[in-house]
C-alpha cells in the first residue's frame, strides 16, 4: 500500500498534433506511471469539460496550461499522502476538489490523466498488469438456471387404448 508522493502534469501532443494533458504520479515506493488524457475530435453537449486556455496565440487556443497548473498545484496538494490503491477515494477527492457537475473547474483532461496514472501506479505497485489489477475489482454475475430436470414430478401411466 504505497502513498502518493507527488504528481506532475505537463502539456504534450496527441496523435493529431493538438496539445493534451499528461500526468505522472510518483509513489513513496519509487514507482511512477504516466497517462495522457485523450481528446475527441467532436464533443457533445453533456460531456465532461475539457479545459483549454483559449489563448489564440498558443496553438490556436488549444493549449492546456491551465489544466497542467491545476495538476501541479491543486490536485497534487490534495492527493499527496493518499493510498494509491484506493482508486475510489482518489476519484472522489478529484470530484470533490473540482466541485462542478461536468469538471469545469479542474478540467476533465486533468482529472482523467491523474486518475488513470494513479491506477497504472497501483497496478505496478501490486506487480500486476493493469487489466488484471482492474479485473479483480469487477465480476460478472453468474446466471443460475435449471437446464435438466429430474423425472420425479412426471407421472408415467399406461398408454391409453384407442376407442373401437
Model-derived segments and spans:
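Metal- or metallocofactor-binding catalytic centers and their adjacent structured scaffolds
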Residues: 38-128
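Single conserved hydrophobic/aromatic residue that forms the stacking wall/gate
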Residues: 154-164
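Well-ordered beta-strand positions in beta-sheet-rich domains
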Residues: 32-36
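Short beta-strand scaffold segments in enzyme catalytic cores
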Residues: 21-25
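Short, Gly/Pro- and small/polar-rich lid/capping loops
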Residues: 1-19
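Short acidic-glycine loop/turn motifs at beta-strand connectors
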Residues: 26-31
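Glycine/threonine-rich beta-strand-loop-alpha-helix active-site module
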Residues: 123, 127-144
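Glycine/serine-rich anion-binding loops at beta->alpha junctions
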Residues: 13-15, 19, 99-118, 143-153
Amino acid at each position: 500500500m504505497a502513498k502518493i508522493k507527488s504528481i506532475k502534469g505537463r502539456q504534450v501532443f496527441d496523435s493529431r498534433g493538438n496539445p493534451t494533458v499528461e500526468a505522472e504520479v510518483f509513489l513513496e515506493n519509487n514507482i511512477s506511471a504516466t497517462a495522457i488524457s485523450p481528446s475527441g475530435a467532436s464533443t457533445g453537449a453533456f460531456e465532461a469539460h475539457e479545459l483549454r486556455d483559449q489563448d489564440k496565440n498558443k496553438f490556436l487556443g488549444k493549449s492546456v496550461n491551465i489544466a497542467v497548473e491545476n495538476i501541479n498545484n491543486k490536485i497534487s496538494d490534495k492527493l499527496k499522502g493518499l493510498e494509491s490503491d484506493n482508486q475510489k477515494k482518489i476519484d472522489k477527492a478529484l470530484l470533490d476538489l473540482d466541485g462542478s457537475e461536468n469538471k469545469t473547474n479542474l478540467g476533465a483532461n486533468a482529472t482523467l490523466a491523474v486518475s488513470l496514472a494513479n491506477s497504472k501506479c497501483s497496478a505496478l505497485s501490486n506487480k500486476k498488469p493493469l487489466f488484471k489489477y482492474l479485473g479483480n475489482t469487477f465480476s460478472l454475475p453468474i446466471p443460475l438456471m435449471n437446464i435438466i430436470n429430474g423425472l420425479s414430478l412426471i407421472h408415467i401411466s399406461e398408454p391409453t387404448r384407442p376407442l373401437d
